[in-house]
């Protein structure tokens, strides 16, 4: 009985890891090959002078403006910090409120802080 590719793939999906390892070892011995990853030549990179798009952003509190208390409340809501920690963060502006967030999250945080009078930058 000849096996086709689908039969082999179905068996691999259902096989235990130890069975797959045994199969790989048997193939290596039978054909004198190794299962090491093959180094592939890198394809063409981005266009010359292209800039990689940033995926993580930091939300920086530049200043708290005229409504320090409201900014502290919003910083607490955004970060989950305690009152003293949030107050220290706000008073030490310019300071990162959140680091390594997505662009949409950074924009949302910026809107919330600006709504209570803070000056905010996204880096």
Swiss-Prot record:
Keyword Transit peptide attached: no
Cysteines engaged in disulfide bonds, as pairs: none
SUPFAM superfamilies xref list: ClpS-like, Ribosomal protein L7/12, oligomerisation (N-terminal) domain
GO MF, one annotated term: mRNA binding
Keywords from the UniProt entry: Ribonucleoprotein, Ribosomal protein
Gene Ontology biological-process annotations: translation
One Gene Ontology cellular component: cytosolic large ribosomal subunit
One protein family per Pfam: Ribosomal_L12_N
InterPro entries named among the record's database cross-references: Ribosomal_bL12 (IPR000206), Ribosomal_bL12_C (IPR013823), Ribosomal_bL12_C/ClpS-like (IPR014719), Ribosomal_bL12_oligo (IPR008932), Ribosomal_bL12_oligo_N_sf (IPR036235)
Quaternary context: Homodimer. Part of the ribosomal stalk of the 50S ribosomal subunit. Forms a multimeric L10(L12)X complex, where L10 forms an elongated spine to which 2 to 4 L12 dimers bind in a sequential fashion. Binds GTP-bound translation factors.
Family of the protein in this entry: Belongs to the bacterial ribosomal protein bL12 family.
Function as written in the Swiss-Prot or TrEMBL entry: Forms part of the ribosomal stalk which helps the ribosome interact with GTP-bound translation factors. Is thus essential for accurate translation.
PANTHER family linked to this entry: 39S RIBOSOMAL PROTEIN L12 (PTHR45987), LARGE RIBOSOMAL SUBUNIT PROTEIN BL12M (PTHR45987:SF4)
Name of the protein: Large ribosomal subunit protein bL12
